[in-house]
Amino acid sequence: MIRIGILGDIGSGKSYVAKNFGYPVFNADVEVGKIYNKDRKIFNKLKKVLPEYIYTFPINKNEISDAILANNSNLRKIISIVHLEIRTKMNIFLKKNINKKIVILDIPLLLENKINKKNDILVFVQSKKKDITKKLKKRKNFNIKLYKKFKNIQLSLGYKKKKSQFIIKNNFTNKSVNESIKIILKDIL
């Protein structure tokens, strides 16, 4: 099984690129949403470490945001609890797709949390800053302070780009992305 990890800036189109490969995708953001909506065990753990912020089940994203914005250490607490569960879900996904030729890992903190393996193929999604900003501002509940907190815990884009074997320039058109994906797949298969 070939594992392709998708890297890039927040809002660069990583999930869009991941879907367009046409292979099974593990999308960590989607899984986090499921955890917040359905996993009472994680809710109880978060409530225990952040009782003044987390009190609603299903977990309210505004409560998570308030906790992160209130204190830098709260983000680390949330990550330590949620990412363990994400790693477990990813391992289940990988076992389920063991016979697939390729799987795509759409995990924002792939390198930061050392989830990638040595022989993973890393694809960096590069987008213009102005396009990213325009896209982010359209997102429901976009919060610039929250965005900056997440940026601060990520490795630099330059480092991620250097670690990647391939770069996809995403100008947010199907054509450019799909042509790049075809070239990558031809090269690795």
Where are these regions (language model features)?
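ATP-binding Walker
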Residues: S12
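P-loop (Walker A) phosphate-binding loop of NTP-binding proteins
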Residues: D9
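ATP-dependent NMP and nucleoside kinases share a basic, alpha-helical "lid"
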Residues: K89-N97, I102-R139
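Hydrophobic anchor at the beta1->P-loop junction of P-loop NTPases
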Residues: I4-I6
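Small-molecule kinase domains that catalyze NTP-dependent phosphoryl transfer to phosphate-bearing small molecules
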Residues: K89-M90, I98, K117-K118, K138-L189
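ATP-dependent small-molecule kinase phosphotransfer cores
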Residues: G33-N99
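Walker A/P-loop
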Residues: S15
